[in-house]
Structure formats: C-alpha cells, structure tokens
C-alpha cells in the first residue's frame, strides 16, 4: 500500500493538468493585448486635440486677448515677453497634440519676421490651424507670406488686439467679453478708435477706467509671477470683474506708491539729448517709468531702458507725446535690428530689445532720426 501511494503521487493528474492548462495558452494569445498594440485610430485622434494661445504677458491687451481666446475655444495660454516669443513658438512646434494655435498681441520685427514665417510654415505642414491676431505695424509682405501658407491673419493697427478678438469671435463669447475688450482698449490708449469707442459707450466711463487701471497695475507688478498671470487669464475668461478678483485693488495701491517714488528718481537721474529724454531704470519696469521720463524731460520722446541680465540685453520702452511727428515704431524696428536686436510697435508707443553693448548707440541714433 505504501508503494501504491508513492506511484499515485508521481502520476498525479493535477500536475499534468497544470502543465497543459489551456488558460495559460489563452493568455498568451489574448486578442485584447494585440488590439491595444495595433490600435492606430485611438492614438491618432488623441494627437490633435490641443488648443494653445501664445500671447503678450506684459500688458492688459495681451492678457485679455488670451482670456477671450480661452473663453471662445478653451485650451491653454502661454504668456511671453518679446525676448521669449520665438522660444515659445519652438516649444509648440514639436507638440504632436497641437490642433489649433492662436498668437496674440505679439508684433514682428525685421529680425524675427522670417523666422516667424518659417516656424508657422512647419506648423501648417503639420496640419495645425494657426491664427495671428495683432495691431502692431507690420511689413505687408509678411502678411502676404502668412496668408500664402493659409495662416488666418487678423490685423488692424486701429484697434487693440483684444477688441479684434472680441469683434471676430463675439458669437462664441458671452456679454461680459465686451467689458474685457473695453478695458484692454483703455490701457492701450485705443478707446477712441471706431470699435473701441462704441464698446466704452456701453459702460460707465469711470468704472471702466478704474477697472482697466487696477488690472494693468496687477499685470505690470507681477511680471515675475507667471502663475498669477495665468490665473488672471482664467479669471477674466470666467467673466470676473477686476474687483471680484481677490486683492487686486490692494495690490494696485502698492504699485501706485512705488510709481510715485519713481517720479523723484526720474527727476534726479534722467538725461536729455536734443530730441529726447532717456534714463536707465534699476528698480522697476521700464514701461512704468517711460512716461515720466518723457514728461519730466520736456521733450516729445522719452526712452526708458532696463537691463535683462539673464538675456544680456536691455528692454527698452519708447513713448512719444501728441506733438511727436514721426512714427516711432517704424524708426525703432530697423534701428534695433541693425544693432543686433529687435523692436517696433505703434507710432507713439513702441519697444525694443537691444544688446547691452549697443544701448548708447541706440539712443544716439534714435535722437538723430527724430525730426
């Protein structure tokens, strides 16, 4: 009997069953795994779903443009200054999920325009929908080149970018979007233009002015806080008034106090040439000080410049008074480019990026070109 037991153990059918278990064979040839590996349709669909808006981060027009694009189309915003403009475009051109790209309130210079066209050409070859919305002075040949590759160009120097976004896509926007556009027009000094003026008439003027001003101080004062700027885009896209966004008025008051201190510093540090006043700014943004430089110098043109140590350049703001007879943007664009930088903008308000070693020459040459 003992022998029988041993024999039984050796030939136990259970062990044989485990070796030839059909379940294991089924797992190896499971069609589900094969389906996952070869399912191209699901992968292809997920590639082209993303909407991105690249917009100017330094003023209300850029932030508000991004907010209205977000309200109309959803998606994400990438906020940049001019030195970071091309870097952002290179970032999105490799994004295989990108479906639609909006570029707002970012003017082009002679230095950047060819590169801009090349990048957008690549995007269009990848079947990405591209819309460029702006109001800065632009070379007509650039517009033709963009239209040739089927980029949708919305461009009018007579209205700020947000107003153009609103006017183009208002069927996709809610009623509050008109107020966002109104505030942007005010802060870009374009509330007297055909569409901008009609929008302003819809609201109490003082209410719109204080809202636009508070928004501007929060944007200018938080340039080193990218998450906050994106938060503002979200809040504005959700139809929040500036006074509904926590601490905006309190922060604006702090910025006003700082600006009042700049007046005394400008009086002490500003320099003049025959046609312009200029000053290097050390402890605030150049754009916030440039109007004081112009006004206190008694000249029709003011230039404020601040070093960007991380880029080895100066960020330059240029402003002209009502008496300024030249188009500053058209002078600054080729001048900055000839010195290895870039620039451009409007007739009485523009900016430039100039290599650190060339800032003195930039100011001297600009002074010569002002009639």
Predicted regions and their residues:
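Catalytic-core regions built around general acid/base machinery
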Residues: 115-127, 145-148
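Structural motif
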Residues: 50-52, 99-102, 129-131
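Glycine-rich, acidic loop segments that terminate in or are immediately followed by a histidine
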Residues: 63-65, 97, 277-371
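Short, structured active-site "lid" loops
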Residues: 95-116
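Intrinsically disordered, polybasic Lys/Arg-rich low-complexity tracts
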Residues: 4-45
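Catalytic phosphate/metal-binding cores of nucleic-acid and nucleotide-processing enzymes, i.e., regions
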Residues: 52-53, 68-73, 77-80, 102, ...
